[in-house]
Regions:
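Conserved binding/recognition cores within well-folded domains
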Residues: 2-100, 104
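Short, charged, intrinsically disordered terminal tails
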Residues: 120-130
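A cross-family signal for key residues in well-ordered alpha-helices
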Residues: 68, 116-117
Length: 130
């Protein structure tokens, strides 16, 4: 008998930030993560690893692009080919990097403009309104 690893995502979106969640199913586990508890998602090949505010991690076999399409735009933003961040936790933005807690994340050129819009960066807003 063949044993195949499968993963399933179940979403429940609330009307406001903090009320939605994602349920991640692995081969032998299921874990519900509230959107408000997810700091970032890190992609590595065919896998995505969720990093929670309590320091826990959950890895599932979905590419980061699938996760980008699955997570709500009003909470999460892709900043690099390997990272999706909960933008509510971004502390610092310097040059081509952003910081959440003690960790710095690179910001790719393809994602910079959207990040500046989401963060309401004043200089970027003035340039885009011309």
């Amino acid at each position: 008998m063949e044993n195949k690893k499968t993963n399933t995502l179940i979403h429940s979106n609330g009307p406001r930030y903090g009320e939605g969640h994602i349920f991640l199913w692995g081969e032998n586990y299921g874990r519900r993560l509230l959107y408000v508890d997810i700091l970032y998602v890190e992609g590595s090949g065919s896998y995505s690893e969720f990093h929670a505010i309590d320091g826990s991690r959950v890895m599932i076999s979905y590419r980061l692009g699938v996760m980008e399409d699955s997570l709500p735009d009003d909470t999460f933003i892709r900043v690099h080919q390997s990272f999706i961040l909960n933008w509510h936790y971004i502390d610092t933005f310097v040059g081509n990097s952003v910081k959440i807690g003690d960790r710095w994340f690179p910001v790719g050129r393809a994602y910079r403009s959207r990040l500046l819009d989401v963060l309401h960066f004043p200089e970027h807003s003035r340039q885009n309104s011309k």
